[in-house]
Curated annotation (Swiss-Prot):
Subunit structure: Homomultimerizes to form the nucleocapsid. May bind host exportin-1/XPO1. Binds to viral genomic RNA. Protein-RNA contacts are mediated by a combination of electrostatic interactions between positively charged residues and the phosphate backbone and planar interactions between aromatic side chains and bases.
The organism of origin for this protein: Influenza A virus (strain A/Turkey/Minnesota/1661/1981 H1N1)
Listed name of the protein: Nucleoprotein
Organism phylogeny: Viruses, Riboviria, Orthornavirae, Negarnaviricota, Polyploviricotina
SUPFAM superfamilies: flu NP-like
PTM field: Late in virus-infected cells, may be cleaved from a 56-kDa protein to a 53-kDa protein by a cellular caspase. This cleavage might be a marker for the onset of apoptosis in infected cells or have a specific function in virus host interaction.
Motif (Bipartite nuclear localization signal): 198-216
UniProt record, GO biological process: symbiont entry into host cell; viral penetration into host nucleus
Length: 498
């Protein structure tokens, strides 16, 4: 990992740029989302969508998925080499919903991938605009994080369902680049590494030959990404051990699971970006907003502003609560699935409830669902305040190694203290401190035992009025500390299935 001095900001990762100053970053991020908006408008024209249909989030998701699939080179190549029945490798499509005679109809559309690529490039000054594609992937990933639970995936890799707050970005595709790596949680990286090690255990040729050499490079790169997320020397030293292992096996899996648990108190730094559905950028471009001239940021007031004045609709199933559907999408837009509910509620200005209490299923509609009974409603995506997105993991007063916030991975840089029962977490650390990482394990456990739950995170950081775009007057909210702030509490969400 490069030293602090050479770190690029997320926006630079997002736009593939080298070091730029704030104005250049704002301009290149603006160019990126403006391109998404122009592409969306063009697709609505191609598909002859009405204004209302173009604002339907389900249509937005279908169009986003089409362009992501059109540019998925590895999969396209695979599909051409392994033709499967009824799948044309050169075409992409999905459900488009249209309003006909007071009812919603589903229409399955099919397009040439080449045509989609042409429209996308045309909207992006003739470039491939990979950054815009990654941006869409992160929006889909944030939506998945808010919608589904990953208990099954956690258990399969030998991790504990209580580590769900470490799983940000667990559904991001591998090709999501540096911007994707920045938003992945510690648990996500650990899970990817464990899967890799397990394949190596079961398949003797996994690390061998020319392919094995590439695999090894990928393994070490993933280790370095994970190492860069940890903020204490002992955790990083343990990652060096895992990376340098001659022949990764169960000892490494054990070390990684230990590190994932330790991240519940000694939080990793994980980026948060507000990525909005393509239709929102489309609405702004259509209303004459010049993104490149105005500039745009994924971590400031801009996304709150966008949502403040765009009207997006969603299909609603018969027994779903539209307010709950709105909460789901609001959380996805702000990458707040792992944020403390009390902080989210304060910013949003309406109570944000845990997932177990939501009467809503996912945003996407399965192809076998009955459209006869479908209704649509406006998503309420506005907020009362705005706050800066963080990447620090919520460690208190800049001590790199203090308690982050348990069972949440903070999204907003807003002062709060940390309701956590250290006993519950320390119970996960019974037993094994021997082996070659024993001294590091002992040190990590000692740091965790010394973490004080009464410490305050993000000291002095607050939320801002929407009129305060320069963030001059922070309002530091006071929270009722008695209740647990995790969104996953009493969870009954569906599992994420590819």
């Amino acid at each position: 990992m490069a030293s602090q001095g050479t770190k690029r900001s997320y926006e630079q990762m997002e736009t593939g740029g080298e070091r730029q100053n704030a104005t250049e970053i704002r301009a290149s991020v603006g160019r990126m989302v403006g391109g998404i908006g122009r592409f969306y408008i063009q697709m609505c024209t191609e598909l002859k969508l009405s204004d209302y249909e173009g604002r339907l989030i389900q249509n937005s998701i279908t169009i986003e998925r089409m362009v992501l699939s059109a540019f998925d080179e590895r999969r396209n190549k695979y599909l051409e080499e392994h033709p499967s029945a009824g799948k044309d490798p050169k075409k992409t499509g999905g459900p488009i919903y249209r309003r006909r005679d007071g009812k919603w109809m589903r229409e399955l559309i099919l397009y040439d991938k080449e045509e989609i690529r042409r429209i996308w490039r045309q909207a992006n000054n003739g470039e491939d605009a990979t950054a815009g594609l990654t941006h869409l992937m992160i929006w889909h990933s944030n939506l998945n994080d808010a919608t589904y639970q990953r208990t099954r995936a956690l258990v399969r890799t030998g991790m504990d369902p209580r580590m769900c707050s470490l799983m940000q970005g667990s559904t991001l595709p591998r090709r999501s680049g540096a911007a994707g790596a920045a938003v992945k949680g510690v648990g996500t990286m650990v899970m990817e590494l464990i899967r890799m090690i397990k394949r190596g255990i079961n398949d003797r040729n996994f690390w061998r030959g020319e392919n094995g050499r590439r695999t090894r490079i990928a393994y070490e790169r993933m280790c370095n990404i994970l190492k860069g997320k940890f903020q204490t020397a002992a955790q990083r030293a343990m990652m060096d051990q895992v990376r340098e292992s001659r022949n990764p096996g169960n000892a490494e899996v054990e070390d990684l699971i230990f590190l994932a648990r330790s991240a519940l108190i000694l939080r990793g730094s994980v980026a948060h970006k507000s990525c909005l559905p393509a239709c929102v950028y489309g609405l702004a471009v259509a209303s004459g907003y010049d993104f490149e001239r105005e500039g745009y940021s994924l971590v400031g007031i801009d996304s709150f502003r966008m949502l403040q004045n765009s009207q997006v609709f969603s299909l609603i199933r018969p027994n779903e609560n539209p307010a709950h559907k709105s909460q789901l999408v609001w959380m996805a837009c702000h990458s707040a699935a792992f944020e403390d509910l009390r902080v989210s509620s304060f910013i949003r200005g309406t109570r944000v409830v845990p997932r177990g209490q939501l009467s809503t299923r996912g945003v996407q509609i399965a192809s076998n669902e009955n459209m006869e009974t479908m209704d649509s409603s406006t998503l309420e995506l506005r907020s009362r305040y705005w706050a800066i997105r963080t990447r620090s993991g919520g460690n208190t007063n800049q001590q790199r190694a203090s308690a982050g916030q348990i069972s949440v991975q903070p999204t907003f840089s807003v002062q709060r203290n940390l309701p956590f029962e250290r006993a519950t977490i320390m119970a996960a650390f019974t037993g094994n401190t021997e082996g070659r990482t024993s001294d590091m394990r002992t040190e990590i456990i000692k740091m965790m035992e010394n973490a004080r739950p009464e410490d305050v995170s993000f000291q002095g950081r607050g939320v801002f009025e929407l009129s305060d775009e320069k963030a001059t007057n922070p309002i530091v909210p006071s929270f009722d500390m008695s209740n647990e702030g995790s969104y996953f509490f009493g969870d009954n969400a569906e599992e994420y299935d590819n």
